[in-house]
Amino acid sequence: MALMVVGLSHRTASLEVLERAAFDARGAEEVLRALTASPHVEEAFVLSTCNRVELYCDVSRFHGGVADIGDVLCRRIGRGLDELGDQLYVHYEDAGVEHLFKVACGLDSMAVGESQILGQLRLALRGLHERGLAGGTLDRLLQTALRVGKRAHSETRLDAAGASLVDTAMTRAAGVVGELPGRRALVVGAGAMSALVATTLARAGLDVVVANRTPDRAQRLAAAVGGRATGLDDLRAEVAAADLVVSCTGAVGHVLDVATVASALLDRPERPLFLADLALPRDVHPDVATLRGAHLVDLEGLGADLASSAVAQDLRAVRAIVAEEVAAHAASLRAADVAPTVVALRAQARHVVEVEMRRLASRVDLDDTTRSEVDRAVHRIVEKLLHTPTVRVKELAEAPGGVGYAAALRALFDLEVTAQGGALPGDAPLSGTVADAVGHVS
């Protein structure tokens, strides 16, 4: 079996496709049932966030896995593989592990360094346990990914990169509405990202209003930042009174449509309105950007600004952590892969000793004391002969390409070992698009 990741994100797919692919907990269960019912998928978990939809699977065959997983995702989106093949990516084995670790650290997020993804990974881990897959391949991988993500946040200044998305939005806003202190900001949503936004805006001296579908959550966040809470029923009036609006909810449809914003702008014909849409699927209808007086920026625009900033230099330490952890994970897998070979070698040695001791007993009349001494001596000799090669093969197996040593040991001693891994052909690419992988099949 081998890890395979098939998915799409803000880096490969349009926002329209990402919106169609996004799903809730019920949708995730449907996708998981479809995946595990396919012939080439043993285990699976789903990662669906504001800027990615990814299926992580333990597969028995590369080509079959690509076909099965790609088919499930395409049916979910409602598009054919011929349309989506270039937007869907595939990673497997070490490349899949590296991708997951980068995701866990926030390196692959639109909001670089954001830590909300760790919560999504915990949900995926809980789902594996609820389906009775604790202790399995993906369970161990997810636990490692969570540890890597926590390590990245604790050992580096990664959290500053997450806040920089909000800083970038504020810089854009100042260019539209002027100096920010004393301005009114409307924050739509009350989740983790909304809390970061509201806190940052309040510290910058803005008047903060928090609007949310659940009044209690809006009230708690507003109280924490010294702001005011409101429900979504008053959204039109709050937009009309605001200088800037930042929306980041988990809603499936648009929270701010063209009609609502257009109506709000009528009450403020001489004042520009800045809107930052930090949600995916979009909270703000993209056509709002066409309204006179409205200045809309979304995740794509902010991400482009962030990528060119000095924050990118602060992420090198995190990338080094990821590289180190990927290497350690690969070494542990290779060491685990050689273990059955070592067990088989020792079992074969024990069998040879037992056969020869029976043969000796049938030919030579030994008393119990002598037979016991001979038996112990033979076992000590065998153990000493096997000790160095078994220790060395474990050490060598941890190095890249070390699996070849286990294969050599099996060949030299004619050992019968249940195949470990072997899901993927040697000429298959480590990463690429699903379109490339399908072409590779043909």
UniProtKB/Swiss-Prot annotation:
Family: Belongs to the glutamyl-tRNA reductase family.
Keywords: NADP, Oxidoreductase, Porphyrin biosynthesis
Family annotation (InterPro entries): 4pyrrol_synth_GluRdtase, 4pyrrol_synth_GluRdtase_dimer, 4pyrrol_synth_GluRdtase_N, GluRdtase_CS, GluRdtase_dimer_dom_sf, GluRdtase_N_sf, NAD(P)-bd_dom_sf, Shikm_DH/Glu-tRNA_Rdtase
EC number: 1.2.1.70
Additional comment: During catalysis, the active site Cys acts as a nucleophile attacking the alpha-carbonyl group of tRNA-bound glutamate with the formation of a thioester intermediate between enzyme and glutamate, and the concomitant release of tRNA(Glu). The thioester intermediate is finally reduced by direct hydride transfer from NADPH, to form the product GSA.
Pathway: Porphyrin-containing compound metabolism; protoporphyrin-IX biosynthesis; 5-aminolevulinate from L-glutamyl-tRNA(Glu): step 1/2
Binding of NADP(+), residues: 189-194
Reactions performed catalytically: (S)-4-amino-5-oxopentanoate + tRNA(Glu) + NADP(+) = L-glutamyl-tRNA(Glu) + NADPH + H(+)
Domain of life of the native organism: Bacteria
Site (Important for activity): 99
Subunit structure: Homodimer.
Gene Ontology BP terms: protoporphyrinogen IX biosynthetic process from glutamate
PROSITE patterns linked to this entry: GLUTR
Protein task: Catalyzes the NADPH-dependent reduction of glutamyl-tRNA(Glu) to glutamate 1-semialdehyde (GSA).
Pfam family, any one: Shikimate_DH
Gene Ontology MF terms: glutamyl-tRNA reductase activity; NADP binding
SUPFAM superfamilies xrefs: Glutamyl tRNA-reductase catalytic, N-terminal domain, Glutamyl tRNA-reductase dimerization domain, NAD(P)-binding Rossmann-fold domains
UniProt-recorded name of the protein: Glutamyl-tRNA reductase
Record: residues binding substrate: 49-52, 109, 114-116, 120
Gene giving rise to this polypeptide: hemA
Active site: 50 (nucleophile)
